[in-house]
Amino acid sequence: MLNIAQRIFGSTNTRLVKSLYKIVNQINAIEHEFQILSDESLKNKTIEFKEQLNNGKTLDDILVPAFAVVREASKRILNMRHFDVQLIGGIVLHKGMISEMKTGEGKTLVATLAAYLNALEGKGVHVVTVNDYLAKRDADWMGELYNSLGITVGCILSDTNDLDRKKAYNCDIVYSTNNNLGFDYLRDNMKFSRNEMVQRGFNYAIVDEVDLILIDEARTPLIISGQVDQDIKMYNKIDKLIYELSEEDYELEEKHRNIFLTECGITKIENLLIQHKLISSNTSLYDIDNMIIMHYITQALRAHKIFSLDKDYIIKDGNIIIIDEFTGRMMDGRRYSDGLHQAIEAKEKLNVNNENQTLASITFQNYFRMYKKLSGMTGTAETESEELLGIYNLQVVQIPTNTPVQRIDLNDDIYCTEEEKFDAIIKFISECHKKLQPVLVGTISIEKSEILSKLLTKNKLKHSVLNARYHEQEAYIIAQAGIPGTITIATNMAGRGTDIQLGGNLKMLAKTTLANILDKEIISIKYKQLVEKVNKDKEIAIQAGGLCVIGTERHESRRIDNQLRGRSGRQGDPGLSKFFLSLEDDLLRIFGSDKIKGMLKKLGMKKGEAIQHTWISRAIEKAQHKVELRNYDIRKSLLKFDNVINEQRKVVFDQRNRILDNDSYNISLIYRDINSDIVNNIIHDKYYNLDDETYKLISSEITRIYSITLDYNTISELESKNKLIEHINNITDEFFNKKIAEFTSKEKDLWDNLTKKVMIMSLDYLWREHLAALDSLKCGINLRSIAQKDPLNEFKSEAFSMLESMMSNFYELIIQRLAHLKSDNIFHSYSKELNNLQSSQDINSIKISRNEKCPCGSGKKYKHCHGENI
């Protein structure tokens, strides 16, 4: 019934696109009006649009002429005219939806339409890319277009300093990466004054490769961390014991990436621990005193049995560098949490660094939901449309291609073993190479790409390898990948950001070929020769069948496979794609059902022979869909827990901003509440009457907080609670009045400035400790389900109680720190104390060279950041 209805009325996507063509026709109808304008008149249109907005018009009201202006400016500046389908993509972005556009359809140019229109409000537009290279490329490239229209453009890279970051954020449009934006938000909420903050709000974001950022990286939070004291030698001691375990000692769940000791394993590891004097002979592994040992063992097992070198991480300059499982890129600066990184360092016999404590964190899910309007672009989002709509309220709109796709997608070939599969791949590549067809081979890991590279070398087939080891040459390798006879092996990273053009990427080739030539006349001659060569090579590649894309195994997500296929057949070019699989591939081995193996037996699978059948293809798709649903459920569950933390983050950051915005504080209101709480808590919680023991406890608490000694004889004569509170208030009033007078005599605003800093530092310290407590709570909360309790509700309840306790401690800590301030040599002693305290909050007493990068993540050297005053 649904298919019949779609044939009659068209799908929702078709109807929406059809309706948008009405707006496109309006833009086309007025195109000639802007063609006759001078460059200056075209630029002045920006001023006109801003005036119209100030006079009450909306962005939708000026969309048609604004898009026409951008199209005309693009023709003049970039020599590129927006196609009608690109205009549709721009409208979709402006409306806060996702434009799904095939590779090569010009997403970078499409973004200029929505970015320009929304920049007219003057509230800022963030164009988000996946790496610094693309951010800089797009800012430089599209910046010429924006500047010609009087729109300012900024670019923020990983090494951009705070001053330049602030300037960039104040531009109309800023290009940056998701990581830079997220970390800037966290760092801003660790700053000690508004003037130090760099961001100016969250108005509108256009996220390129939106599926990668909002889906694939949704489970990885951004974390600013500092090191904590711990027994790092224990990681090496435990690592040595892991080699003593056999397969019967642990149970591995590859689907969920979990590992557990069996009863046999527990007995063996306990004996080994006792033998090496790591636990007492009369204790058990699960005794309270030994629970931390269990933590070390679990992480060591995960490091050895679940995480693999050249797949999950590589070793570079003596450090473990995590590999992004979705892009294949190195994630410099990222570390596994909860001791896993240290366990891997011990496994690889590297120097084990201290574990980190979270100072601030946020997930991309919650970061991007702060924007008033959010939109995105990608070549593959339809398979994740349910999640994008459910979590981010983003509708996916499939934009038609400008010219029909001519790529041929061949059926998968399935072999018994990986060895047979690789033999078939080499044979297929060799056949393509003979007819000069360019080939791109996609692998899921560095390990597999290097196995294939060795086989190609053995067969004397010249090729290039693009993976995290050689990421510096990425742009150049991609530029060459469409040249006839070229063979390129790539991990997932190759599918992002850069087009593979048949014949080669002229702009990139010109940049590398002509870089060292100074004579303009020679450059002109060489460039013409290069253009002729690229055009000739393009024809050869087309005649050979276009780019051939080979997948060496299926990814867990259909979307990643579609991205690989999408490298071929750009803008109507011919192309070919084919996947080679084996029963030893992770997807089929872990997630494939016995049904698939049964099918293959029925089809008479023999060694060295490939099977092609629609049954198998459908079964594999079902396995992928099953994994996608599982991953979606995991992300949904994580989001529910993170939403609890996110709401608390908003409360704390809002409180922090209110402190920063306030210039004077009525401290007496705080300490009077605290005095009342001290007396009430001691009397109500522990004692019913005002007796000697009660007076001693109250006196002790007052001394602890204020360093004031109460006169025992005086307070013991007070017969009521109210009189006692009044007496303590009078004493603390007098104490603080003297202290304030003492400080203000040195400098008028000194007390208020110190109070503000103490309040900020106290809140930051307690928030850091609170995050650690929430992490611990979250780790064990699922065990509550054994007692028939909902873990999420339990987490919400306890997290709220913990926040209440934190805020109560916050006020007490403020008073305690202020009470202990000394005015003697305040500009020297306390200024140094304050700076040391601030530094310890941000980096948690890390011992670091002054010329190394600051651990806070600012990108600056330590001596120019948190080590400036040390």
Swiss-Prot record:
Origin: domain of life: Bacteria
Keywords per UniProt: ATP-binding, Cell inner membrane, Cell membrane, Cytoplasm, Membrane, Metal-binding, Nucleotide-binding, Protein transport, Translocase, Translocation, Transport, Zinc
A GO molecular-function descriptor: metal ion binding
Cofactor(s), by name: Zn(2+)
Bilayer topology annotation: Peripheral membrane protein
GO cellular component, one term: cytosol
EC number from the UniProt entry: 7.4.2.8
Residues that coordinate or bind Zn(2+): C854, C856, C865, H866
Pfam family, one: SecA_PP_bind
Localization per Swiss-Prot or TrEMBL: Cell inner membrane; Cytoplasm
Keyword check for Zinc: yes
Cofactor note: May bind 1 zinc ion per subunit.
Binding site for ATP: Q86, G104, E105, G106, K107, T108, D499
Chief place of localization: membrane
Catalyzed reactions per annotation: ATP + H2O + cellular proteinSide 1 = ADP + phosphate + cellular proteinSide 2
Gene Ontology BP terms: intracellular protein transmembrane transport; protein import; protein targeting; protein transport by the Sec complex
Classification via InterPro entries: Helicase_ATP-bd, Helicase_C-like, P-loop_NTPase, SEC_C_motif, SecA, SecA_CS, SecA_DEAD, SecA_motor_DEAD
Family (UniProt): Belongs to the SecA family.
Subunit record text: Monomer and homodimer. Part of the essential Sec protein translocation apparatus which comprises SecA, SecYEG and auxiliary proteins SecDF-YajC and YidC.
Task performed by this protein: Part of the Sec protein translocase complex. Interacts with the SecYEG preprotein conducting channel. Has a central role in coupling the hydrolysis of ATP to the transfer of proteins into and across the cell membrane, serving both as a receptor for the preprotein-SecB complex and as an ATP-driven molecular motor driving the stepwise translocation of polypeptide chains across the membrane.
Name of the protein in its database record: Protein translocase subunit SecA
The species this protein was found in: Ehrlichia ruminantium (strain Gardel)
Source lineage: Bacteria, Pseudomonadati, Pseudomonadota, Alphaproteobacteria, Rickettsiales
